[in-house]
Every structure is written in C-alpha cells, then in structure tokens.
C-alpha cells in the first residue's frame, strides 16, 4: 500500500505540473509531490528495517499534499502581483560589506570554539546540543551570506558570488549541523533559474558526499562503521530519510507519546506559566524496528494539536501562504524568500520548520526586505 501511495503521488506530481503557472521557475507543488512520492516508494524498499505504515498515516500524508496543492494552484493561478518597497536606496556595496563583516566575525568565533574543543567538530557538536557551548551568530550570518550570494549572482559579480559561497560553506560546516548544510545546498540549487539533469545528478552526488563526510567527521553512524564504512553511511542515510515516518506512524497508532503542547514550545516564555509547555524541543526516543529515533516528522506536532483535521487545515494554510508568495512577480527579494520556503517544505519528512522555527522565517524575511530596498544598478 505504501508503494501504491508513492506511485500515486508521483503520478499526481506529473498531472499537477500542467495546472501550475508555467512562468513559475520553482514549481513547488511538483517538487513536494514528487519528493514525497519517491520517499514513500523508497520506504517500501526499506520496510524490513522499519514498521509498516498504516492506512491512517498514508491517508494523512495524501490529504495534506492534496489540500496544499489545490490551495496553492487556486491562489497562484489567480494572478501575478508585485512585491516592492518602491525605489531602493541602499547601494549593493554596503550590503556586501555589512554581510562580509558579520560573516568574518562569526567564522572567527566558530574557529575559536573549534580550537577550544581541540579541533574536534564532534566534541563541539555535543557541546552545542547539550547547551554547554553557545552559538556564534549563525542565525544571522548565514542568511546574510545567502542574501549576498543571490545578489552577486543577480549583478553578475562572480568574485563576490564565489567569496560568499565559500563563506556560506564554511559557516555551514562550522555549525556541525546537517540542517545548515541542506540550507546551503537549497540556495546553491535555488540560485539557478534552470537546473539541467546533469547538474541535478552532480548536486545529488555532492549532497551524498557531504552527508558521508559529515557522518565520518562527527562519528555519527546508525551501524558499526568498523570495516564497513560504506554500509554504515547508507544505514545512516536510511535512518535520516525514513525514521521520522516510522515514528510518526507509531504516534498515529498510539504506540508513542509526545510532550503536550509541542507547537507552543517557541512561546514558552509567553505562555509557560499558564500552559503545560515542554522545557525542551528534544523529543523522546522510540524504537522503530532495527533502530531508535527521536525524529517524528513535521506531521506529529500538527497531528497532536488537530488530529486528522491537521492535514486539511494546515494543508490549506500552507497552500495559501506558498500560493501568495509564488504569485508575486519574480524579482530579487521574492526569489530569495521563495528559495528559503523550499527548505521547510522539503524538511517535512524530518521535523517541523514553520511554527517551531518562526525566528528563522523572520530573519530570512528581513533579508528579503533588505534586497527589496537595494538601489538598482543603472543597467537594470
């Protein structure tokens, strides 16, 4: 049944491509449905390692994607509007200088932290996770770096583009988090208005290479790497891709529990005294077959709050939000924020990056505003 559902989503993605606006460079509905179709087909071939997905779980995923897609199409086809703050007044050079300064400061702090942890990214990562090591401004420096990558590509300033691409990559590596590496790759792909099949294959190999390198450096494997390093890397990739689905399925089947009011965690300072809100966003571990996981997809906190209705309500809300943004006429600011919006949608299989990551959305939106206020060059 899982295989059939995945096949239906892939077929739906092909059909829906005909219904979405042809002028949209980033066909977000096609990406979402094709990705989930491939993911579910992949789960079928790896089901011996995980729990089988129930009909309720598959229905929830199908319903969410259907209502998201239909709402998006209705909004995006209604017309193209302009996102603008009028005539820009900030010269590009000041954006480059400001972002460059913030990036260099952030990298210096990151290197100091790495030095204090004996140049071990693994030890540094453990310190960041347990709170004994504070961050080094990645939440601001990385979006600014992506912002300048986008700007430099638009202005055809190759030296600036390569410089900020390198800075972004260094920041993503120093973060010790695969999340920031994925964000880096989303922007590398999103900057290009057209990606050939050959480039897509190269990006895929590059993604796998970064994933493997990250696992080796951090020593994070789902099976014993001793003498079987390639097998251990594939096992780790298997867990990252499919464990959230398995855990969500167990939660739907009432074989797992989550802390109450999980979606309110970012607002614990506001409602912490009136509601029972978790003190941490780290979820409980659960056995999913061969392995354990504490990742439950983005669907779990939605399902906790709204039950099966979450597929309809949140599907419509996100479809409306994405439809609005992807109905704007293409410009620098819109393209930058559209690219960011691809990230939380792709990461649904892993964890929630909307309400639980509202600060991230706010920072990237501010960067989009910064690009909107940029003074256009004479030839534009």
UniProtKB/Swiss-Prot annotation:
Metabolic or biological pathway, per its Swiss-Prot or TrEMBL entry: Bacterial outer membrane biogenesis; LPS O-antigen biosynthesis
Into which EC class is this enzyme placed? transferase
Q: What does this protein do?
A: Polymerase involved in the biosynthesis of the lipopolysaccharide (LPS). Catalyzes the polymerization of the O-antigen repeat units on the periplasmic face of the inner membrane, leading to the formation of the lipid-linked O-antigen molecule.
Query: Which EC numbers does the record give?
Result: 2.4.99.27
Q: How does it sit in the membrane?
A: Multi-pass membrane protein
Q: Which GO terms describe its cellular component?
A: plasma membrane
Keywords annotated in UniProt: Cell inner membrane, Cell membrane, Lipopolysaccharide biosynthesis, Membrane, Transferase, Transmembrane, Transmembrane helix
According to its UniProt record, where is this protein located? Cell inner membrane
Residues crossing the lipid bilayer are 1-21, 27-47, 55-75, 94-114, 132-152, 169-189, 201-221, 229-249, 282-302, 306-326, 332-352, 353-373
User: What is this protein's record name?
Assistant: O-antigen polymerase
The gene coding this protein: wzy
